[in-house]
Amino acid sequence: MPTSGRALGALPLAILFMTLLVPLPGCANHARVVSLAGVGADITPPPRVELCGTLSLPSHWPDGTPVNGLSDLVWERDAGLLHMVSDRGWLHRARPRFEDGQLVGLSPIDSHRLRDGDGLPLEGSAADAESLSLLHGTNGKLGDSEFWVSFERDHRLQRFDRDGGPLAAPIRPAQAADAAPNKGMEAMTELPKHGLILGLESPPPGAAPGETRLFTLDGKQWRYPLAAPTGSALTELTADGDDLLALERAFAPPAPLVISLRRVRLGEPPELDVETLASFSSADGWWLDNMEGLTRLDDGRLLLLSDDNASPLQRSLLVCLRPR
C-alpha cells in the first residue's frame, strides 16, 4: 500500500482540490453518503458495473475507536455483518444498511485489537494487517467465526478468533519471503478447490515486469499479469463461484489514480486467464482513493474499501458496485 508520506506528497492535484470542497472525514463520527463522482463531473460508471452507493467513513466511531488505515473487509452471511481489519491492528464489526438497493449507512457493532500469544495488542510493524479471510461464516451458526489475517512488513499469516485473539502460531509462507517489506501478501481469499489463495501486491524479485504471484499454502503458484495502467498493484481477491475477483490500484503520480476490477480464472499452475471488468480513473473525474478491500455480498453486489493512510487529505470509502 502507499505509505502515509507518499500519499500526502503525491496526491493528484485534482483529487486534492476536490477534497477541499467537501467536509473532511474526521468532522463526524458517523458514515456519510457521498458521491464517487467528483464535484461537477458528468460521468457514468463503466458499462459492466453500476454504482449502488458510496459512504465516507469517519476517522473514529462514536465511542472514540480509530477507524483509519482500513485494509480489507469480509461479509459474514450468518450474522449479516461486515468485518473490517486495519493496518493498525484493529478488527471492526459493523452492519451495512441498504434502502432500495442502495448503500446508505454503516452501524458499528464493536472493535477489538489483534493480539499476540501473550494477549498484548499488536503494535507497529507487527500490526500491519492487509487481508482478511473468514472461516465458518456460512454454516448457520452465530458466534463461531474465525479469520485468517495476512500481514506485511513482517510477512506472515495467522488465524484469529472473532475478538482478535490468536488461535495458532503464525505461518510464514516461503512464496512471500522475497517480497519487499511493503509489497507482501496484500490479497487473500478461499476457493473450494484450492483452499486459501494469496497474492503479492507487486512483482517479487525475478518475476517478469508487470507480473506478480498468486499461490496456495500447499505450493501451487500462478503468474498474475497486472493491469496496464502505470503503477498497477494487486490489492485484494475475493471468491465468485470458482473464479476470483481481483481489485487493483494504479498509483504512480503524476499518472492518474486508477482502480480496476478484474475476473481471474485459474488454470493449471502457473497459467490463468484475467479479464478486466471495469476501471475507474481519476482522469475521468472519479473521486477515488486508496482502494484495498473487496468482498462479495450474497446477491452478487460487491463492496470496496479504501485505506485513508490516517491522512486528513484522504478518505475511508465504502463503495457498492453491482456487476451487470
Residue ranges and their predicted role:
Residues 2-5, 9, 17-324:
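Sequence/structural signature of beta-propeller domains
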